[in-house]
Amino acid sequence: MRLIPLKSASQVGLWSARYIVDRINGFKPTADRPFVLGLPTGGTPLNTYKRLIELHKAGEVSFEHVATFNMDEYVGLPEDHPESYHSFMHNNFFCHIDIRPENINILNGNAEDLVAECKRYEDKIKSYGKINLFMGGVGNDGHIAFNEPASSLSSRTRVKTLTEDTRIANSRFFGGDMEQVPKLALTVGVGTLMDAEEIMILVTGHGKAQALQAAVEGSVNHMWTISTLQLHPKGMMVCDEPSTMELKVKTVRYFQQLEAANIGRL
C-alpha cells in the first residue's frame, strides 16, 4: 500500500486532482471505452473537486468520456434535498464539468425495492468491466463509504444502518440536528471497492489520525474497514500532516523518502 504524506489538506486536494487527471489522460478514453471513476461525498474531497474543476476549465482534462459511480446515498431523502448526495455531487462537481448526464451513476435511495436497486448498481458496474480508479474518504472510526465497523470485508452494494457516531458526524450538514440525519443508506460494499483497479483514499485532519494509524500500521480487521486497503494491489492513501499524528515517526519518514519524487510534483 502506498502512503503519500503531504503538509496540508489543500495539498491533498491538488495532488489527488492531478493524479486523477493524469490517469484519465493516460487512459485516452473514448465513447466506447470510457474511464470509470468512483467518487465520494463529504468534506474531505471538496478540495479535490475544486481543483478538478480548475484543471478542467484550464483545458487540461475532459470528462466527456468519463463514467462515474458514487459510493453511497441516504435512504429516503429526495434527490433534490440539499443534503442528498445527488445534490452534493451536482452542486460541487458535475454542473461545473463536461460530463454527460447518462454517464453519472448514483444509487437511488428512494427506490421501491432497495435490494433490487443495489443489485442493479452492482450489475451496472460490471457492465463497464471494472472501476478504473475509486477515490474515497475515511470516517473517524475507519469506515469507507457507509461500511461501518464490523462490516463484512467481502460485502457488496447493500442497505446499511448508520451508526450513531456516523449520524452525529453527519449532523453538521443537517443544522446540527441528528434526528434529521437518515438512519439508513445504500452503499457499495468493501468487496465492491476492492474490485476496482485502483483505490485512492483521502485522509485529512487530526480526527482521522486513529483511522489512518489502523489502516497503515494495524492488522486487517473488520472493525476498521479501511484496513482492507492493505490487501489491494494498488491501494493508496493521500494524507495531510495532522492526520499522521498517530503514526510512528519512522513510518512517516519511510513513506516520505519512498514517495519523495511523487510528493515533489506539487
From Swiss-Prot:
Record keywords: Hydrolase included? Answer: yes
- EC primary class: hydrolase
Give the positions the UniProt entry annotates as the active site: D72, D141, H143, E148
Which one GO biological process term can you cite for this protein?
Answer: N-acetylneuraminate catabolic process
Reactions accelerated catalytically: alpha-D-glucosamine 6-phosphate + H2O = beta-D-fructose 6-phosphate + NH4(+)
The record's listing under Gene3D superfamilies reads: 3.40.50.1360
Alphabetically ordered keywords of this record: Allosteric enzyme, Carbohydrate metabolism, Hydrolase
Provide the Gene Ontology terms for cellular component: cytoplasm
Q: Which family does it belong to?
A: Belongs to the glucosamine/galactosamine-6-phosphate isomerase family. NagB subfamily.
Job description of the protein:
Catalyzes the reversible isomerization-deamination of glucosamine 6-phosphate (GlcN6P) to form fructose 6-phosphate (Fru6P) and ammonium ion.
How does the annotation summarize its subunit structure?
Homohexamer.
What name appears for this protein in its UniProt entry? Answer: Glucosamine-6-phosphate deaminase
Its taxonomic path starts at: Bacteria, Pseudomonadati, Pseudomonadota, Gammaproteobacteria, Aeromonadales
Gene name linked to the record: nagB
